[in-house]
From Swiss-Prot:
Protein name: Kunitz trypsin inhibitor 6
Species whose genome carries this gene: Arabidopsis thaliana
InterPro entries with a match to the protein in the record: Kunitz_inhibitor_STI-like_sf, Prot_inh_Kunz-lg
Glycosylation sites: 94, 127, 136, 144, 197
PROSITE patterns, sorted: SOYBEAN_KUNITZ
Signal sequence range: 1-21
Alphabetical UniProt keywords: Disulfide bond, Glycoprotein, Protease inhibitor, Serine protease inhibitor, Signal
Database matches in CDD domains: beta-trefoil_STI_AtKTI6-like
Length: 203
């Protein structure tokens, strides 16, 4: 009888644990600035923290104000020209209809190829502990140099790079007013938010 009771208790514990796990997975959806779930293959603008800071991800050449100059890379730009912020789309490895935290994904600028490069973000390693985000990444999930994930911070979100046990955090340089994006261990994180359009974010 005791054995049967212990087995039932163990079964209930496993069932409760499993159910809790399913619930927690359902709560890790990434949300945009309007409170809607972020969806794959839908354009979003990326801001530093909230849109109040007026800092946006743009596809530009570092050090140039000409939007058509090459080479280009993802940059966080302070008070950019209204036409400069470039929306991105998140491409998932799975068939989910929403983007979830920690899910493997690719980040791709919306629009045609420019400067002869794909719009997919890619980390180029400078050394064993630091890399920089450029373009011409691959849409294939087998290419680790182009694999990112989104994680919740206290109030916003952040990007991490790599699908190993120790992903790096995407942070920004100190190059005001245009910041390059770095992939570094034990560094500050670039806290971000997502907006479907600039009109809503500015309103």
């Amino acid at each position: 009888m005791k054995t049967f009771q212990l087995m039932m208790i163990s079964f209930l514990f496993v069932a409760i644990t499993t159910t809790s796990g399913v619930v927690s997975e359902g709560n890790d959806v990434v949300y945009d600035g309007e409170g809607d779930p972020v969806k794959p293959n839908v354009p979003y603008y990326i801001s530093f923290m909230t849109s109040d800071y007026n800092m946006w991800i743009c596809r530009m050449q570092y050090g140039s104000t000409d939007p058509n100059s090459c080479p280009q890379q993802p940059l966080m730009v302070t008070h950019p020209n209204l036409a400069a912020p470039t929306p991105v789309m998140f491409v998932l490895a799975n068939k989910s209809d929403v983007v979830r935290e920690s899910a493997k994904l690719k980040i791709k600028f919306v629009g045609p190829r420019q400067c002869g490069k794909s719009g997919f973000w890619k980390v180029v390693q400078r050394n064993s502990s630091e890399g920089e985000v450029f373009l011409n990444g691959s849409k294939s999930m087998s290419h680790n140099d182009s694999t990112f994930a989104i994680h919740k911070t206290n109030e916003y979100y952040k990007f991490t790079f790599g699908d190993g046990d120790y992903p790096t955090t995407i942070s920004m340089t100190n190059d005001y007013p245009i910041y390059r994006l770095l992939s570094k261990r034990l560094s500050g994180e670039m806290e971000i938010y997502f907006y479907k359009n600039l009109t809503t974010s500015e309103g």
